[in-house]
Amino acid sequence: LVGSEMCIRDRKEEAARRGLDCENSVPLQYDAYLKPEVIRMFKETGVLSEKELEARNEVKWEIYIKKVQIEARVLGDLSLNHIIPVAVRYQSLLLDNIAKLKETFGGYPEYDDMSEEPRRLVRKIAGHICSVTRMVDEMVEARKKANRITDLRTKAIAYHDTVAPYLDEIRSHIDDLELMVDNQMWPLPKYRELLFIR
């Protein structure tokens, strides 16, 4: 395991050893409110009844679902309508550059060296474009499947387990594209630019 993954695994093992809850699924964390001892505590203190706790959990699951839905829709839109078109445009510029290098230096031995980096970039960009497009499609299908579920808890768990993981995976490919695509063409503020906004 690498760095943070090892740290997370160690923390989970330590929490389990101490008898602490180490659940990291948000929808499942809300189940703690419906444990018998928690219900009893809320009843005895007169704060909330069991029905009120159940209602609050339903609201929390619904809020979680809505947040992941919105984030998935926005990321899908940004990916397909803003990031991919810019990456394709930049890739086309690189391909034009490769064609002009071949036209000018095609018969000379230095052509391979001169065109190696643009060709490598074109391949990498193409890989990221394909991955983002495929993952956005898969994420949309996972959302459609989760939306057919009527029970809010089960639906929230489905969103956590099948939709939310795509957010990080897609973002990782977009982060890589951000480092490759020409700064002038990139449609969104880059991380380094956000650091210096006043």
Please annotate each region the language model reported.
Residues R11-R198:
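Mature extracytoplasmic or organellar-lumen-exposed domains after removal of signal/transit peptides
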